């Protein structure tokens, strides 16, 4: 132990550590003392409890030390979180973000047509749908255009819009890099990115914003809708809305527009049918609004008239009405009905001009003629007698 203490007392350095490492130290077994040997250690036992005064200054924070700040993860500094129910209201923003569609007719041969009255796009499956993006001021560098599809009705808005299992499993229209479950795709742009939100699982597609070319005021993005609206297991005849947003590279919203989409076999026919139904609905709504107003006016007019007196009603029965000389206009549809009613009117006018005595004489004369004519037709008619073989005429 003396040699070990002598070596340990040497100044510690890299060379002395090597000497200590090479030394073969013999471990000395230390036996615990017997119980009798603990008698001298009674003085080390605590006869009284430890009394320590509490120092409140230990928990005081000096004013010079900065307060601890909460840790911020990388998710907090990234793009803003996506809402569970995306907003569909239009928001042009400070840049005047707008959407335009090419003018097209309602012919049966068209593959894509837009109705301004309905704010609805009708297109066929996997056909090109050009959408023009217009801004009043250029967005910051790195801006992107996002397309997101959601269900229109509140009862279905929480569901994610996906393709039906049939169109996902077939090899047709599934050759590109886009995931098979995404409904909205971008055509002719290799820089498109297909996203799936980690919280809502909604599908969207992003393309970098491209400034308009020389001589043009809009940027065109070609979209495809890869499933019919009537597909079972997919949209299942549920109407959908497509939301187009202009965002910065960090995800800040710059503008938003939305429109309804119907994917069908004959876009022109369906657009024409829905526009006709919209006009009928508007006419019906207008009629229902005007009818109560007319009823209110009529009730007010009747209320403004004086109440009839019981004594005056007896006089009006004996005397002619005051309004007999008033002229009324009757609109009649059809010339035959007009001629018939005109004859009735002429006969009534003549009956008023003829005196009552002459009218009775004429009526009696017509009645006697009718009776005489009827009595004349009751008698037997004279006919020639038919000859029979056995009978002979007088000449024979």
From Swiss-Prot:
Q: Which UniProt keywords apply?
A: Activator, Apoptosis, Cell cycle, Cytoplasm, DNA-binding, Metal-binding, Nucleus, Phosphoprotein, Transcription, Transcription regulation, Tumor suppressor, Zinc
Q: How is the cofactor bound?
A: Binds 1 zinc ion per subunit.
In this chain, the site described as Interaction with DNA is at 108
Residues that coordinate or bind Zn(2+): 164, 167, 227, 231
Q: Where is region (Oligomerization) located? A: 325-356
Per UniProt, subcellular location reads as: Cytoplasm; Nucleus
- What cellular component terms from Gene Ontology apply here? cytoplasm; mitochondrion; nucleus
Motif: Bipartite nuclear localization signal; annotated at 297-317
Q: What SUPFAM superfamilies does the database record attribute to this sequence?
A: p53 tetramerization domain (SSF47719), p53-like transcription factors (SSF49417)
The molecular function terms in GO held by this entry are: DNA-binding transcription factor activity, RNA polymerase II-specific; metal ion binding; molecular condensate scaffold activity; promoter-specific chromatin binding; RNA polymerase II cis-regulatory region sequence-specific DNA binding
Q: Does the record's keyword annotation contain Transcription?
A: yes
Positions with biased composition (Low complexity): 77-89
Motif Nuclear export signal covers 339-350
> From the UniProt annotation, which stretches of this protein bind DNA?
90-281
Keyword NADP attributed: no
Q: Which PROSITE patterns match?
A: P53
Q: Which cofactor does it need?
A: Zn(2+)
Stretches for region Basic (repression of DNA-binding): 369-392
Q: Name one Pfam family in it.
A: P53_tetramer
Where in the sequence is the signal peptide annotated?
none
- Description of how the protein assembles with itself and partners: Binds DNA as a homotetramer.
Q: What does this protein do?
A: Multifunctional transcription factor that induces cell cycle arrest, DNA repair or apoptosis upon binding to its target DNA sequence. Acts as a tumor suppressor in many tumor types; induces growth arrest or apoptosis depending on the physiological circumstances and cell type. Negatively regulates cell division by controlling expression of a set of genes required for this process. One of the activated genes is an inhibitor of cyclin-dependent kinases. Apoptosis induction seems to be mediated either by stimulation of BAX and FAS antigen expression, or by repression of Bcl-2 expression.
Instruction: State the similarity comment.
Output: Belongs to the p53 family.
Protein name (record)? Cellular tumor antigen p53
Taxonomic source organism = Oncorhynchus mykiss
């Amino acid at each position: 132990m003396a040699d070990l203490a002598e070596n340990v007392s040497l100044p510690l350095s890299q060379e002395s550590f090597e000497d200590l490492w090479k030394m073969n130290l013999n471990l000395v077994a230390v036996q615990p003392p017997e119980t009798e040997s603990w008698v001298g250690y009674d003085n080390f036992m605590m006869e009284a409890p430890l009394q320590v005064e509490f120092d409140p200054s230990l928990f005081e924070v000096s004013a010079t030390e900065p307060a601890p700040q909460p840790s911020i993860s990388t998710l907090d500094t990234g793009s803003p979180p996506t809402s569970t129910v995306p907003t569909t209201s239009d928001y042009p923003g400070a840049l005047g973000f707008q959407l335009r569609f090419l003018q097209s007719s309602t012919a049966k041969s068209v593959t894509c047509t837009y109705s301004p009255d309905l704010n609805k796009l009708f297109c066929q499956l996997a056909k090109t749908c050009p959408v023009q993006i217009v801004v009043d001021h250029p967005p910051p560098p790195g801006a992107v255009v996002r397309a997101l599809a959601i269900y229109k009705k509140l009862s279905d808005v929480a569901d994610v819009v996906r393709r039906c299992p049939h169109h996902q499993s077939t090899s047709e229209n599934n050759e590109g890099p886009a995931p098979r479950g995404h409904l909205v795709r971008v055509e002719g742009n290799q820089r498109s990115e297909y996203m799936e939100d980690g919280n809502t699982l909604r599908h969207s597609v992003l393309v970098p914003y491209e400034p308009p070319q020389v001589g043009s005021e809009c940027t065109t993005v070609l979209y495809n809708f890869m499933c019919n609206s009537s597909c079972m297991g997919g949209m299942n005849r549920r109407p959908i809305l497509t939301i187009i947003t202009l965002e910065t590279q960090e995800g800040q919203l710059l503008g938003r527009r939305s429109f309804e989409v119907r994917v069908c076999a004959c876009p022109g026919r369906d657009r024409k049918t829905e526009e006709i139904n919209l006009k009928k609905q508007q006419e019906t709504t207008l009629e229902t609004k005007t009818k109560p107003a007319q009823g209110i006016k009529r009730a007010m007019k009747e209320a403004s008239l004086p109440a009839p007196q019981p004594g005056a009603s007896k006089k009006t029965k004996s005397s002619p009405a005051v309004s007999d000389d008033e002229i009324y206009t009757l609109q009649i549809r059809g010339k035959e009905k007009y001629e018939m009613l005109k004859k009735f009117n002429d006969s009534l006018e003549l009956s008023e001009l003829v005196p009552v005595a002459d009218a009775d004489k004429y009526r009696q004369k017509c009645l006697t003629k009718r009776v005489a004519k009827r009595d004349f037709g009751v008698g037997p008619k004279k006919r020639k007698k038919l000859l029979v073989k056995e009978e002979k005429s007088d000449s024979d």
